[in-house]
């Protein structure tokens, strides 16, 4: 549940823990996995084009889209004010929650399950997803 708990909820419901630290870890894990899948899936691509594509995929907008696709928005625990302010639709909230979920997946199962999820998310966008 921590991965889906926004800081506003944790503030209103102590001792609930929020997802910010998990999002920090998830950002790093996601960057590694996306970079690896891009390098393996596009042999001969230069670092410039790989960097641009990775940045597009892991942008706040891109992550929010993936979060919606996975239904993360429906599972978020938000404080009253954040919920009333449209927190479930905020790209930054969704992106952070997805990063936190991926970090929790990594902590529980290592890189393999994260690679599996990210590969599935990348494929509909026409990305090469090897590994």
Model regions and ranges:
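Double-stranded RNA-binding/processing signature
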Residues: 1-131
């Amino acid at each position: 549940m921590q991965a889906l708990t926004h800081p506003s909820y944790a503030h209103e419901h102590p001792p609930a823990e929020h997802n910010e630290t998990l999002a920090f870890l998830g950002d790093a894990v996601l960057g590694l996995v996306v970079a690896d899948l891009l390098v393996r899936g596009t042999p001969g691509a230069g670092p410039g084009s790989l960097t641009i594509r990775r940045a597009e995929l892991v942008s706040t907008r891109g992550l929010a889209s993936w979060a919606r696709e996975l239904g993360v928005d429906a599972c978020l625990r938000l404080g009253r004010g954040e919920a009333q302010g449209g927190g479930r639709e905020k790209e930054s909230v969704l992106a952070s929650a997805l990063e936190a979920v991926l970090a929790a997946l990594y902590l529980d199962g290592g890189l393999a399950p994260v690679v599996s999820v990210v590969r599935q998310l990348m494929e509909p966008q026409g990305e090469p997803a090897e590994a």
